Each structure stands twice: as C-alpha cells, then as structure tokens.
C-alpha cells in the first residue's frame, strides 16, 4: 500500500501541476510588457466585464456541455445591467475555451486580463483549467472565483498555506472531508456488504496527489484497507498491473479520480480481465450522463458524488428557478439531459453578482476581492459561506452519492442517476437504494 500514513496536506505534498503556466504572469513578464498592473480597470466605468473560462473541448469537454445554455440565460438575465452603489453598469460576459489544457488556459487568461481588460474572472472544472487561470489572476491582481475542483487541489496545489493564503482568488467546491463522509456513508450504510478493501487508482496529477495525501489516510482511519498500486500517468493505455493488484487483494470497492478517456480504457480492461468490484465510486469522470453513456452497459451501477441535482431543494438567486426548474429548462432548451455542472456554474455567477453588489465600487479590485471573501448566501447549488470555510479563500458545498442506472419509465435518455445516499444532507431526498455491481 502506497498511501501515506499522514493525512495532512502541505504545499510540498501536493503537486503544483500547472505552476509553470503562472510564469507567464510574474513581475517583469507578460503583464509588464503589456503595460503593467493597475488596481482598477482601464475599461469604461459603466461596463463590467466578466471573463469566463471552462473546458469546452478536449478530454474534459463534458464539463463544458452546459456553456451555451448558461451563457444565453445569463446574458438575458444581465440585459438590463446591474445597479451597484447607486450607479448602473452594463454587464459583458466574455467566455473562452481552455481546451482542457493548462497552457491554453493560461493563454486565454492572459488575453482576458490584458486585451479584454476584465474586472472579474470566473473559471470552472478540473485543475488543468482552473489552476493556471487562478494563478494568472492572483499575479495580475484580478479578482477570481472558481469551482468544480476539489479545494485542496486548488489551494495547496497552487502553493497556498493557512499562513499564506491568496488575496485575489477564491473557490467553492467539495474537498477531502466531503468525499470521505460521502464515500464512507455509502460504503457502510448503503446496504451492500463488502470486505472493506478499496482498490484505488489515483493519478499523478493535482487531483490524484491531493486525494492520495488526504483521502487515503482518512479511509484507513475509518477501517478500510487501501490497495494502492501507485500513481499512474494520465493517458496510460495499459492497466493490467493495477487490475492484477486489485484481483489479488480481492478489492470489493473501487475508487478513482481519472480523466474520462483513461477510466473508459481501464474499466473495459478490468471487465475483460475479470475484475468486478461490488461497489465502484468514481470522480472527475462518471459525473455526467455523456460520460456514462460512452461506456454503454459497463456504466450501469457506477456511483459518483453529486454536488448538484434537480433534487436539491435550493433556488437560484439570479433566475428564481428551483434546481428542478433549471434542469427542466436545460433539457427543454437543448434536448440534452441535465448534468451537475449546470448547478455549480450557475452558482458561480450567483456568488459573483452577490460580491459585485456588496461593493461601493465594483471596479475596485481590492474591494471586490474582499467582497468575495465575505460572501455568504444560498445558491441553487446550496449554502455557501466564505467566512467559515476550511481555509481562507474557500467555501465547501453539499455532496451526496448517486448511482447510474439504465433509464426506465419512458425516459428519452439512456441513463439516469439515482440519489442513493444523502449522508448529512437529509433535506436532499434519496431516490433509491445502492445496488451492487455483482
């Protein structure tokens, strides 16, 4: 077993992964060449320019599926502008595709900061996109809010410590504590008996490093035996060694945090080579219907954490839609099945508007960044509180466990997730019981 005994995280113990991209934004670098850094925007004061970066293409493209729907809805929401401090501002959202690539993410961040002169950056989905954009904003003193990355991978992965937090970059999402609580609740109370041996595939990337250092020790303390063949590289094509280790240990629970194409390769090889756990709880993939559909019948029975679903009993502060209404709106407008990124990305803009309205001058970068750090509100994704997070700059959010099943009851879609464990969040209703994979 390669999981360390110490569950604490430090800036040294988590792979920075995307740190090289931040070099574009150091003093004397690109920003200086483009005219330096100013504490307020050079754009017309009556216009608030919001940059939005997400992976719309590349390995993490599934996370960008809701973008067109959200951009249309949000631009309509902001068509009359925002009134802040007695002054009316028009709002422009400038969206960019990171292509699921850290270097591209850094480049589009540079363009938004230096050419578009944005006042606020919003960025979402995976460390490969979020971390380089956040690094760029911290260096340029641009307020930035992000989501859909485990907070430890965002915080420690970018070099922060409780003694030296960030000034301009803020984040909300789940972390190791939420994952640990959700997984152990499902694995012990879900009704599927196991030998409590967990085969893990945690990659050599920011997510994998944070999970190995944080989640592994906590699972061990909770009485699970971790079967860890070691970190693997993203893009690996042959998982025979890992599969052999899991079979030898009879790991009846499986957990992984891979890129979607990597999991598809592994899961097919696992079935071919005779590894079939009783429970498989996955993250970073298996979160979206398209990712499950791509697996065909092999996707049935996989479980995953859900940070948003139509069952969440919350309402958007921007559109006044309940979670169910927002999901139905998406399906009617696009013909596609809802996915949980809709909730987190809508909440991203909800927090942004809350912070903008809390300032006397939304173009004062320092004031806007401070307002993000004081934000406390209930969004369509649930309650967020940046004043009492696990560390400065961070708020966590609810997480429940769902299981993917073949759609029934005349559904127009191929698969459907069922909430099978709500843990500490009793106000989020369960829809069924966990079913074993074998």
PLM ranges: what are they?
Residues 1-13, 20-29:
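N-terminal secretory signal peptides
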Residues 37-43, 62-69, 81-159, 172, ...:
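Beta-alpha junction/loop-to-helix N-cap segments that form part of ligand/metal-binding clefts
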Residues 151, 270-346, 358-359, 416, ...:
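Extracellular/periplasmic periplasmic-binding protein-like sensory domains
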Residues 48-74, 96-103, 125-126, 201-210, ...:
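Extracytoplasmic "Venus flytrap"
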Residues 211-311:
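Extracellular/periplasmic bilobed ligand-binding domains
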Residues 32-33:
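C-terminal motif of bacterial Sec signal peptides marking the signal peptidase cleavage site
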Residues 373-438:
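Solvent-exposed, acidic/polar segments of extracytosolic/periplasmic ligand-binding ectodomains
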Residues 118-228, 279-304:
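Extracytoplasmic ligand/sensor domains, especially the bilobed periplasmic-binding protein
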């Amino acid at each position: 077993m390669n999981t360390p005994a110490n569950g604490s995280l430090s800036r040294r113990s988590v792979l920075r992964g995307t740190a090289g991209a931040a070099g574009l934004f150091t003093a004397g670098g690109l920003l200086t060449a483009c005219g330096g850094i100013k504490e307020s925007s050079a754009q017309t004061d009556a216009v608030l320019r919001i940059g939005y970066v997400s992976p719309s293409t590349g390995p993490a493209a599934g996370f960008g599926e809701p973008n067109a729907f959200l951009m249309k809805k949000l631009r309509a929401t902001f068509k009359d502008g925002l009134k802040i401090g007695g002054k009316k501002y028009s709002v422009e959202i400038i969206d960019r595709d990171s292509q699921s690539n850290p270097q591209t993410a850094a480049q589009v961040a540079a363009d938004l900061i230096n050419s578009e002169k944005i006042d606020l950056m919003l960025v979402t989905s995976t460390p490969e996109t979020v971390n380089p954009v956040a690094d760029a904003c911290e260096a340029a003193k641009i307020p930035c809010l992000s989501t859909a990355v485990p907070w430890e991978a965002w915080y420690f992965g970018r070099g922060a410590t409780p003694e030296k937090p960030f000034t301009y970059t803020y984040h909300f999402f789940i972390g190791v504590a939420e994952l640990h609580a959700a997984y152990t609740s499902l694995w012990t109370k879900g009704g599927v008996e196991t030998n409590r041996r967990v085969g893990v595939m945690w990659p050599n990337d920011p997510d994998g490093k944070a999970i190995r250092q944080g989640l592994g020790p906590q699972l061990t303390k909770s009485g699970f035996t971790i079967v860890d063949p070691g970190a693997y590289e993203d893009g690996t094509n042959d998982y025979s060694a890992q599969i052999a280790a899991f079979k030898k240990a009879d790991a009846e629970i499986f957990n992984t945090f891979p890129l979607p194409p990597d999991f598809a390769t592994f899961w097919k090889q696992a079935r071919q080579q005779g590894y079939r756990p009783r429970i498989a709880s996955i993250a970073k993939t298996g979160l979206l219907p398209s990712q499950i559909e791509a697996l065909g019948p092999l996707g049935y029975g996989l479980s995953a954490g859900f940070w948003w679903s139509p069952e969440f009993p919350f309402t958007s502060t921007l559109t006044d839609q309940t979670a169910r209404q927002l999901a139905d709106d998406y399906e009617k407008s696009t013909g596609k099945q809802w996915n949980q990124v809709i909730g987190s990305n809508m909440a991203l803009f909800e927090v942004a508007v809350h912070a903008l309205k809390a300032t006397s001058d939304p173009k004062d970068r320092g004031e806007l960044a401070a307002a993000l750090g004081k934000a406390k509100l209930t969004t369509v994704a649930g309650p967020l509180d940046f004043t009492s997070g696990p560390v400065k700059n961070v708020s966590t959010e609810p997480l429940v466990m769902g299981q993917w099943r073949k759609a029934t009851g005349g559904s127009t879609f191929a698969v459907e997730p069922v909430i099978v464990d709500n843990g500490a969040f009793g106000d989020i209703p369960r829809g069924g019981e966990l079913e074993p994979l074998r």
